[in-house]
Amino acid sequence: MAGNQRQGVAFIRVNGMELESMEGASFTPSGITREEVTGSRVYGWKGKPRAAKVECKIPGGGPIGLDEIIDWENITVEFQADTGETWMLANAWQADEPKNDGGEISLVLMAKQSKRIA
């Protein structure tokens, strides 16, 4: 039976190092993205594979800079909610053009698969 706690914050680690992630981080598990199949009626759905994705922002000027982030590939990413739910993304990569906008660095990390580990 679930308790009363709901997710409030998330902790994100890259190769074991916790990022200074700001409010609003998100995680999408790997799986199948479903799209409806329609004609004169709705017939069902079809799917296509979906990569796992972690999106977050970290403050600029911290211990990790854009030069390091740009080179991230074959990294291990861990997304842990304060509720204890934890997901692992092995062999992940930096998937977008990281940028510093107004003192916040935006990150998108992706992997072929994600696995719930807690």
Swiss-Prot record:
Keywords: Host cytoplasm, Late protein, Viral contractile tail ejection system, Viral genome ejection through host cell envelope, Viral penetration into host cytoplasm, Viral tail protein, Viral tail tube protein, Virion, Virus entry into host cell. Coiled coil: none annotated. GO terms for cellular component: host cell cytoplasm; virus tail, tube. InterPro entries: Phage_Mu_GpM_tail_tub (IPR019596). It is found in: Virion; Host cytoplasm. Disruption phenotype: No tail is synthesized. One of its GO terms (biological process) is symbiont genome ejection through host cell envelope, contractile tail mechanism. Induction: Expressed in the late phase of the viral replicative cycle. Expression of late genes is activated by the viral late transcription activator C. Polymerizes to make up the central tail tube that is surrounded by the tail sheath protein (TSP). Tail tube protein polymerization takes place around the tape measure protein (TMP) and is probably directed by chaperone proteins. Upon binding to host cell, the tail sheath contracts and the tail tube penetrates the host envelope. The tail tube is involved in viral genome delivery during ejection. Homomultimer. This is Tail tube protein. It comes from Escherichia phage Mu (Bacteriophage Mu). The gene is M.
